[in-house]
Amino acid sequence: QMFTNNFDPVAFEIFSLSVRWYSLAYIFGIIFGWLYCKKILIKDDIIQKLFEDYISYLIIGIIIGGRLGYVIFYNFSYFLNNPIEIFMIWNGGMSFHGGLIGIIITTYLFSKKNKTDIFIFLDLVSIAAPIGILFGRISNFINGELVGKVTNSDWGVFFPDYDDKLRHPSQLYEAFLEGIILFILMNLIFFNKNYKIG
């Protein structure tokens, strides 16, 4: 029996405002990534204090960069004709690459302002990032986007909102490889090699 992806992209509604799984993925990714850095990775008291201030820069970079990346890279002509919709992020539409660029820019600005090494914070983000990637790819699967190639395999999935073909659940492959495996590898390097952030 093949699995059919009939998930609703909307997790729940609050006062007629739809809260999507993709939004929750960002929220959970940021929260768990922040907790992991605070409780496990950061040992220096000064960096702990700076990281408290840095997290707001990080969130701004993720949201603005991710949204602008989606607008520019994926649907520029549409948003050029409907500019007000650029601000409607609750309707979905974020870019991983745009978010990455946003993080680098806001991290640079924060480091320059506080006269600290930019690589301290980029290292922390890169070690914790697979947590966010895991949640993000799972939400991609729920949304039925970034689908894989056509397959006849037993674990193929139907994405009825995409087409009527059986496809690889590539989002779950990426969640496993880029989320779980990458997280393990990054942390093995960090802890086994006595790696110093920065």
Go through each PLM region and give its residues.
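A feature for loop-to-transmembrane-helix boundaries and adjacent hydrophobic helices
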Residues: 1-198
